[in-house]
Amino acid sequence: MKYIDEIQILGKCSEGMSPAEVYKCQLKNTVCYLKKIDDIFSKTTYSVKREAEMMMWLSDKLKVPDVIEYGVREHSEYLIMSELRGKHIDCFIDHPIKYIECLVNALHQLQAIDIRNCPFSSKIDVRLKELKYLLDNRIADIDVSNWEDTTEFDDPMTLYQWLCENQPQEELCLSHGDMSANFFVSHDGIYFYDLARCGVADKWLDIAFCVREIREYYPDSDYEKFFFNMLGLEPDYKKINYYILLDEMF
């Protein structure tokens, strides 16, 4: 790796649920970001190598960070990427209509991408295989206190078995995979980031995560109805519930 020893770390970014570490850095007077993760996650959708390759495939299809460099060193994967400009989607939380319009715009852009030759699958069978790997290696999120209040399960293996036995029929498109707060809004469009789980998947995966966000920020059900009116879809609550449950141990 050419640049990993040249970057100057400016600070660590706020912690999320991901096991990856993210740092704001400077490289040759340019702000960039360094993302690092232990290589035990290399076979999962936490992999920053996977994220880098997905970003490069998307580079002429959507607005995404530029990949400056990625690779493996001392049992960790590294990704150095460019900084994104614009307002984070969370800046619009106090403006529900604008916030929901941004979500819908982002979904439409993702779902319009031709998925032929997409390098990665995030379909249910892939995610369940990944979840089994995480459970077997004791790196899944099995702390039920982190789960949604609406989750009916209180045992990780019972939930995993239910997910295996109740897989819905998939309507495939390009999915962000961790949709909701992972994009910026600028004068020239939407910029996507945190793309490690991006790939071919059911369109309802991203929709489910948007619904989860809307419910958290806007308890008034009229906003959820507005979201589906904007999408031009009737809600499939069976699928929405499935994908929210699938996300519990990630």
From Swiss-Prot:
CDD domains xrefs: APH (cd05150)
Cystines in this chain: none
GO biological process entries: response to antibiotic
Catalytic activity: kanamycin A + ATP = kanamycin 3'-phosphate + ADP + H(+)
Molecular-function GO term, any one: ATP binding
Entry keywords, A to Z: Antibiotic resistance, ATP-binding, Kinase, Nucleotide-binding, Plasmid, Transferase
Entries under Gene3D superfamilies matching the protein: 3.90.1200.10, Phosphorylase Kinase, domain 1 (3.30.200.20)
Top-level EC class: transferase
Active site: 178
Family statement drawn from the similarity comment of this UniProt entry: Belongs to the aminoglycoside phosphotransferase family.
Function: Resistance to kanamycin and structurally-related aminoglycosides, including amikacin.
Name of the protein described by the UniProt record: Aminoglycoside 3'-phosphotransferase
